[in-house]
């Protein structure tokens, strides 16, 4: 009856919750983070039936949703810095969403929380409903299950406990028997005292009688039997008091012995269970540690490319993790590039030599006289002066070239504070640490001497856009925005994304020029100068961070005369390269990461490029 009453009362309590209507459905446009390439994109989001779904647009809902998550176990987290953003995570899946304004965000959060509360996991009424049946079943069988499992491996202890119960029953019976005997004895003593009092009174009232012969006749009531009659207490017949006392003593001795044995068994069992507990605790600790590490790795993978881990002032990734991620990405790019180069070498044979009409002989040495076309591997541009290079950036080009020829070729000693950061054979890389508003602006200067090539050849390969993809591995795409002159072009190029750093693009003017020698002893000098400019055809965009550059490749050709009348070969020429780079990367990349990456990438670039030039010019006529 009580069970029925409890069920009825429980049902009456749930009636109001059952009658309450479902949560209100909601739909609208929210910005969703797609990936690090496309960033935030507007999506049509629908909140319905305790699930959150999104579509590309409202018009495409009939084609099905692009993604959906159940809100039962979802965690909604408003962002600490962005007032319009909130994140929804379910296990290792995370949605990054942005509303139009803070009020709009709060409306969405409230609606999602309401759906979550009304779901099976979030509702208290659901917990009561599901918990009631479980509690009834478990309450009925809990004790029996526990006792059964406890005694499965405890036969000795169970037997000793049975002995204790037997001792208890024996002791109770013995106590009852002895108590009964003592009560009977007490009743008998009381009755005997009353009888004695009565006998004494009768004796006092009994006078002697006169016999016929005149003698006194005394009564025999005063004899022993009359004065102290033998009274047997009722109820004590058949009780062996001595035997009961001995048995009682043995029982009381057996109880402590059995109890001691029980305690000993329990101590042994406790030690055994303690060892098992310690083992399980250690296993639990290892499991929790492995789970924690696994969850950490899963979170890293799930947030890979997430907006919180991107380069920025509020990035959640520290400098060490930032550098590790950048280094790992660069290593992957290097592996891909090595595979690509191996495939090119296997499939493509080196470019054939130009036809004979492109050469003329002077003495016994052949050199290129006719320029290559723009589509050829190298274009020869004979520029002795800048008189024909008149365009709107001419004055800026002149200033840049003069500055590089004046300062870039100076010795690294003195007060310039150049630091030698890399030295590999004849190649040396120097750096001056410069920061402005927290942004690293370190100028870098690299010098290297390359045998078998001329400065003209090196500069042509560095300037010519037709062969740029053959040696430049960091560019995603590029195009010529404007051709200012035969030796001056404006280029827009986008560099490959290296997560977590933001993607960079560069808009710069590239000019190649031959510097006239002031004296006969001065070496032949060529220069390629690249510096950032602005152009209406390539405005800033939100996808990339615009970097600013000022780069110069200065090459001087040194010729050692051949022995006798032999012709000049590539063994007699040496190119002294001076590469100077001033780069403002923009953005929020950590200074330590930028310096470490520059120290790694600049020497690798210079070695890769010069090796490429040596490979391309091997076996070809020398281009002075």
From Swiss-Prot:
SUPFAM superfamilies in the record: Bet v1-like, PH domain-like
TM regions (residue ranges): none
SS bonds (residue pairs): none
Modified residues (Phosphoserine): 126, 132, 135, 315, 373, 377, 380
A GO cellular component entry from the record: Golgi apparatus
Binding site for an N-acylsphing-4-enine: 472, 493, 530, 579
Post-translational modification: Phosphorylation on Ser-132 decreases the affinity toward phosphatidylinositol 4-phosphate at Golgi membranes and reduces ceramide transfer activity. Inactivated by hyperphosphorylation of serine residues by CSNK1G2/CK1 that triggers dissociation from the Golgi complex, thus down-regulating ER-to-Golgi transport of ceramide and sphingomyelin synthesis.
Occurrences of domain PH (ranges): 23-117
Matching PANTHER family: CERAMIDE TRANSFER PROTEIN (PTHR19308:SF53), PHOSPHATIDYLCHOLINE TRANSFER PROTEIN (PTHR19308)
Quaternary structure and interacting proteins, as annotated: Interacts with VAPA and VAPB. Interaction with VAPB is less efficient than with VAPA. Interacts (via FFAT motif) with the MOSPD2 (via MSP domain).
Recorded domain comment: The START domain recognizes ceramides and diacylglycerol lipids, interacts with membranes, and mediates the intermembrane transfer of ceramides and diacylglycerol lipids. The PH domain targets the Golgi apparatus.
Protein name: Ceramide transfer protein
Organism, scientific name: Pongo abelii (Sumatran orangutan)
